[in-house]
Regions:
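C-terminal accessory helical subdomains adjacent to catalytic cores in phosphodiester-
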Residues: 1-8, 17-45, 54-179
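Short hydrophobic beta-strand segments
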Residues: 10-12
Length: 179
């Protein structure tokens, strides 16, 4: 029995576009929707979604550690836009009050600018990570196809061919796959 058939997933992200992207990747990696025990995304229009994820992360991680940290095979997947911050700066902000270790089944994904940057790259319509592709991909559906494509891309590509945020994401997915 593979790790993925036993593992369950908790997802914390900004919006439905990110959620669909994560689900698409997970499906391609061997998880199905029944593996998702928790999906938490910012209520539309309530506040800055990036801020909401940052504020929610500490509580979610503590719940994850307390409820699932001992003996259960649960993976926590977090996605937050980088906006104008680098991947490392955004991760540092997120983990300001609580740190994740490399051995924990916690993965943090930070699309530079926003998830639409990754969509543009996967479509071959990409100039750089600083450009905002949100308008062009705002109504793109389903986003899950991009998650599936990223899985294939991570498995087949050299990291040096990827934008920095995608290189980091592929490393995070690889680390989770090895746990």
């Amino acid at each position: 029995m593979s790790n993925k058939t036993r593992s369950q997933l908790m997802i914390l992200c900004e919006d439905k576009a990110q959620l669909d992207f994560i689900k698409g990747y997970c499906k391609e990696a061997g998880w199905d929707n029944r593996a998702i025990i928790s999906q938490d995304l910012c209520p539309a229009g309530s506040q800055s979604a990036e801020q909401w994820v940052r504020e929610r992360f500490e509580k979610t991680l503590r719940t994850f550690r307390g409820k699932y940290g001992q003996g259960r095979s649960v993976v926590l997947l977090v996605m937050i836009d980088g906006d104008k911050f680098s991947v490392s700066e955004r991760k540092k902000q997120l983990q300001q009050n609580v740190q994740c270790t490399a051995q924990e089944p916690v993965a943090i994904f930070v699309p530079k600018r926003n998830i639409q940057s990754w969509m543009a790259f996967l479509d071959g319509d990409f100039e750089n990570e600083e450009q905002d592709y949100k308008q062009k991909y705002q109504r793109q559906s389903p986003n899950s196809k991009y998650g599936r494509n990223l899985r294939k891309f991570c498995l087949s590509s050299s990291p040096e061919k990827l934008p920095a945020s995608l290189e980091d994401a592929c490393k995070e997915w690889g680390r989770i796959d090895r746990l």
